[in-house]
Amino acid sequence: MVAERSPARSPGSWLFPGLWLLVLSGPGGLLRAQEQPSCRRAFDLYFVLDKSGSVANNWIEIYNFVQQLAERFVSPEMRLSFIVFSSQATIILPLTGDRGKISKGLEDLKRVSPVGETYIHEGLKLANEQIQKAGGLKTSSIIIALTDGKLDGLVPSYAEKEAKISRSLGASVYCVGVLDFEQAQLERIADSKEQVFPVKGGFQALKGIINSILAQSCTEILELQPSSVCVGEEFQIVLSGRGFMLGSRNGSVLCTYTVNETYTTSVKPVSVQLNSMLCPAPILNKAGETLDVSVSFNGGKSVISGSLIVTATECSNGIAAIIVILVLLLLLGIGLMWWFWPLCCKVVIKDPPPPPAPAPKEEEEEPLPTKKWPTVDASYYGGRGVGGIKRMEVRWGDKGSTEEGARLEKAKNAVVKIPEETEEPIRPRPPRPKPTHQPPQTKWYTPIKGRLDALWALLRRQYDRVSLMRPQEGDEVCIWECIEKELTA
């Protein structure tokens, strides 16, 4: 019985199932899972394994190969199936996504006893039956067939026939050959010779091709650009991921679009690279329309999708923005003309300035007080009267003395009296009063405010400078007449 795909679960419900492979791989499983590449794509994976008598001594290596390869596919929506073949084929694990059943299927696979012939077509037939029951073209399936010997008789033709049926159902077929296999036989069974993985070193070397199988089989779409477009606009879609070269060799890559979940169309991509793809997209004519994007690598038989949706939105055509910019530029030009018009195109004739006011009269300085000069008692010189008895004083100045004093001769006992000048005491300067106000506290915006104030003062000064040149009421203004006079001169 084939299990159907389980319904969607909450993110937390996958916590334990997502770790089942790490538990099976032992204590170092978590570290290896972080270091080794993995595949997050959701698809159905079928292992078709040779259990003929020639692999009896190497079955544990085949089991380890299956276990380690299954660890790399980490999508919670992935489903697995184990099929073994010899003279007949047997389903060890029907297709299921239940992690408990997968763990039990691995245990059953480990206990298989190899015996019989190598009828690989019988295993492919059971895989095709499960693909049809699981949904056929609605699912993305991968078949990995492993054998160790040459196919005899009609087995190669039967195997090729079953492989074609698998591809018609949308499945990709990969072959692993160990030791004594024939390369040409497996190339005809697989999709291409690049999808055949030879292991010449024996079963112990199987683990060396796990990364190669993963790189070839895991095709993922990780990013879509753009996610929104303008209504009525032509555009192209860029898909980013890995494994895009899978179907590009035979031209079977298609970009599939579903518009509003109503109709579907497919186109060939413009270019396909290993990790990117460029596809032309249909035009969306209404706002709110959605475009669901998916990719097919087998000519449309099966598709790969992952919530890749493009939405149409209303967009302005840019004319309104251009008009607004032009209007702003026009207003700016008018403002500049108004500012510089008085400087370049107007000559202002002003009335002559009034005569300057008379200079103020300088006040006469007060004469300095007369200096006290020494006086001489001329009585000792015999002047003023008979016998010089009458007292007479002679005052000396900067120009000499009086006429009487000029005719006198100094007596021996003449006395010169010099008035004593009293020195005024020096008054000490009163101390400077202490400032009564505190300096303003500096704010964080003080430097910015200072620079803005300086810029505003500069603009005001320039404006005042221009405004002084503007004509005032009563001024005579000449524009073209003055220009003509200058030209004629």
UniProtKB/Swiss-Prot annotation:
Glycans are attached at N250, N260. SMART domains: VWA. It comes from the Eukaryota. Expressed in prostate, thymus, ovary, testis, pancreas, colon, heart, kidney, lung, liver, peripheral blood leukocytes, placenta, skeletal muscle, small intestine and spleen. Gene3D superfamilies: von Willebrand factor, type A domain. The chain crosses the membrane at residues 319-341. A divalent metal cation binds at S52, S54, T118. The keyword Protease does not apply. GO terms for biological process: collagen fibril organization; single fertilization; uterus development. It is linked to Hyaline fibromatosis syndrome: An autosomal recessive syndrome characterized by abnormal growth of hyalinized fibrous tissue usually affecting subcutaneous regions on the scalp, ears, neck, face, hands, and feet. The lesions appear as pearly papules or fleshy nodules. Additional features include gingival hypertrophy, progressive joint contractures resulting in severe limitation of mobility, osteopenia, and osteoporosis. Disease severity is variable. Some individuals manifest symptoms in infancy and have additional visceral or systemic involvement. Binds laminin, and possibly also collagen type IV. (Microbial infection) Interacts (via VWFA domain) with the protective antigen (PA) of B.anthracis. This is Anthrax toxin receptor 2. It comes from Homo sapiens (Human).
